[in-house]
């Protein structure tokens, strides 16, 4: 009898589990070639405060070291303002010189007005198959700004993907322009 009762209880809870899911995670990946040596490209992109020197949509960057709310460690943060009026605060999680990989995450809150939440980027610089060139791979993982499945327009998955793609497309143009002079 206890066995049947426990099965009945479990079966009655199943419908509630279906409503416990959050929004679906999104991913954007951009790969592009830059006509410059990897070490030169890496030197440009690993300078966390220098994004305004190569990203054409950046109008202002404010860099400061401060404690991370998640880990308590002091991390480099940058507040980035864009031409379209959006802004976001990012923290550098890792800059790995051996792998030429930069890992940074957007800090959700009042400083981040872009249409995403829980946004993380991994930017990696690799030698291209073409001598003297570099392959840059930018991968973002994120959720929509509303962080819900029924997000309103402008804070939904299409808006989040659009914002991420626009940011990365401009980054590709800017890196090429800065490095291929």
Per-range role (PLM):
Residues 7-15:
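Bacterial N-terminal signal peptides
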Residues 18-70:
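Hydrophobic ligand-binding cavity/cleft-lining segments
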Residues 62-114, 170, 174-181:
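Glycine-rich portal/gate segments that line the openings of hydrophobic small-molecule binding cavities
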Residues 35-39, 93-100, 124-135, 180-181:
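A short, structured loop/turn motif at beta-sheet edges
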Residues 30-32, 63, 88-94, 118-127:
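Hydrophobic/aromatic beta-strand elements that line small-molecule binding cavities or substrate pockets
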Residues 1-4:
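Positively charged n-region of N-terminal signal peptides that target proteins for export
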Residues 40-44, 51, 78, 92, ...:
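Hydrophobic pocket/interface hotspot
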Residues 20, 135, 139-181:
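A conserved amphipathic terminal alpha-helix motif
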